[in-house]
Amino acid sequence: ESFTGLTSLRLNEGREFEEELASVEELLMEYEEAGIESPLIGFDFKKLLEEKHKEIVLKDELLRAVEEDRIIPFFQPIYDIKTGKANKFEVLMRIKQGDKYLPPFQYIQIAELFNMIESVDFIVISKALEYKKKIDANDEVELSVNISGLVLHDYKFLNKIVKKVDELNIKHSN
């Protein structure tokens, strides 16, 4: 007799962490009652569920940040040693939370995991371009923006960026 209960094990976003843990424990008991050795002996379900729960919490935080327009581009100057002037800026993503700005690393991972990275990258790029348009009347400042490798080869995404650059009358070289 085969036991297929394991295939239905997944973290449901609508359920509480404790419910998920209880579900796993119940599944393991069913294995034991059926006299089947669990292939999951030694696997730390609590840790896995804690990680998945954290991912969902971060995803919800990221969604709220998008909805509340709290994704902010930061501009890190890149100085020309010869002139001592910043002629380029690297655009970095931050998430505004109260009076603080959160670093993006874990949120970028979450955006990639939940297929939100295209939206997040485009928000950062759009805001950076709009700010550049306001402060750079002569269109001389160059921006360097890091985008996810997951969207780098997506022609629709790249065309959206080109369209935004054209809409703002910014030179493609900058």
Model-predicted segments: where are they?
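Catalytic/regulatory signature loops of cyclic-dinucleotide turnover enzymes
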Residues: 20-45, 60-72, 132
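Nucleotide second-messenger and two-component phosphorelay signaling modules
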Residues: 34-35, 64, 68, 80, ...
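Catalytic core of bacterial c-di-GMP phosphodiesterases, primarily the EAL and HD-GYP domains
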Residues: 8-10, 14, 18-21, 85-88, ...
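Conserved helix-loop-beta segment at the catalytic/binding core of cyclic-nucleotide signaling proteins
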Residues: 1-3
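Flexible, glycine/charge-rich interdomain/linker segments that couple
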Residues: 7-12, 30-57, 74, 140-147
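Catalytic-core segments of nucleotide cyclases and related cyclic-nucleotide turnover enzymes
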Residues: 9-36, 56-59, 105, 158, ...
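Catalytic-site/binding-pocket detector for metal-dependent nucleotidyl cyclases
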Residues: 48, 115-116
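Active-site core of bacterial EAL-family cyclic-dinucleotide phosphodiesterase domains
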Residues: 44-110, 146
